[in-house]
Amino acid sequence: MITRLFENDKQLEGFFSSLDKKKKYLLALSGGSDSLFLMYLLKSRAIFFTAVHVDYGWRETSYQEASDLAALCEQEQIPFILDRPEATDPMDSRDIENAARRYRYELFYRLCKEKCFSGVFLGHHADDQAETILKRVFEGAHLGNLKGMSAQVMYRDVALLRPLLHIPKHKIVEALDSHQVQYVQDITNCNERFLRARMRERLFPYLQDVFGKNIRDPLLSLAGDSAELREYLDQQTAPFLLRVVDNERGKLLPIEQELLKTPFLAKWVCKQFFLNEGLVASKSFLQTVYDHLMTGSTARLRLRNRTVLVKARGVIIESIY
């Protein structure tokens, strides 16, 4: 058994020092290198947790792998939950990757509520983070939304905990190999039918070969800059959102001419105003709103199921009657 892992890692120390060790948690245990590493890490930090494994039955070996994980957890005196959803062939659905993720998260949420777990540990690492950031770049995400996954974030009212986001995959594998720990090699992670697998198997190696340098660390640096930008934007936005009022037509966001001199901030203020009402505005929609504000022209726009009225010096989300 691995007794201590990354004892001098300051980021891990900071993460676990902020954790309430009197509470109990879930660990999403796939059996791969990442989740097994995290399992031993949690044991070494005296975290009380239950491992949960979802066997989709996609591989011929998955039944035996689930049994092996159950035996390992029994050996390590770790409570273990096995879930087997109705078998689905991963080649039968175009959205199976996201569907499987949604199923897992709903399962984690239900278990946390039923058994009073305080959060779920997930084994995402630095390479996963880099993939997420590059994917968001290609999707055209806002500069303030390139921060990637957070070490702690709420899924509804359940905490998702990712302490490994700064640790590269190769260090995780090296640590397990040095202790002769066996882990599952999930072939579906290499199935290029899935976007993540294509990025991992083809895109990242290609970019690193052409660029001639590691691209993971610059992407992680970009995520750090994005997180700082997001924090700054939120600070700058707060005073404007405090001016939102209810009037006879709905929610009114007053817009002063001075704000319009900074289009980046003006559009972010509008974006957050819409988000606070549960509305996600695209870049093109925000640009349209900004253009009308700049010209002082009046416009009635549709955003999902709501009407947005733009006029000189203000934006109104009309009430639903």
From Swiss-Prot:
ATP binds at residues 30-35. Its EC number is 6.3.4.19. The keyword Nucleotidyltransferase does not apply. Pfam families: ATP_bind_3. GO terms for cellular component: cytoplasm. It catalyses: cytidine(34) in tRNA(Ile2) + L-lysine + ATP = lysidine(34) in tRNA(Ile2) + AMP + diphosphate + H(+). Keywords: ATP-binding, Cytoplasm, Ligase, Nucleotide-binding, tRNA processing. It comes from the Bacteria. GO terms for biological process: tRNA modification. One of its GO terms (molecular function) is ATP binding. It is found in: Cytoplasm. InterPro entries: Rossmann-like_a/b/a_fold (IPR014729), TilS/TtcA_N (IPR011063), tRNA_Ile_lys_synt (IPR012094), tRNA_Ile_lys_synt_N (IPR012795). Transmembrane segments: none annotated. Its main location: cytoplasm. It is an enzyme of class 6 (ligase). PANTHER family: TRNA(ILE)-LYSIDINE SYNTHASE-RELATED. Belongs to the tRNA(Ile)-lysidine synthase family. The N-terminal region contains the highly conserved SGGXDS motif, predicted to be a P-loop motif involved in ATP binding. This is tRNA(Ile)-lysidine synthase. It comes from Chlamydia trachomatis serovar L2 (strain ATCC VR-902B / DSM 19102 / 434/Bu). The gene is tilS.
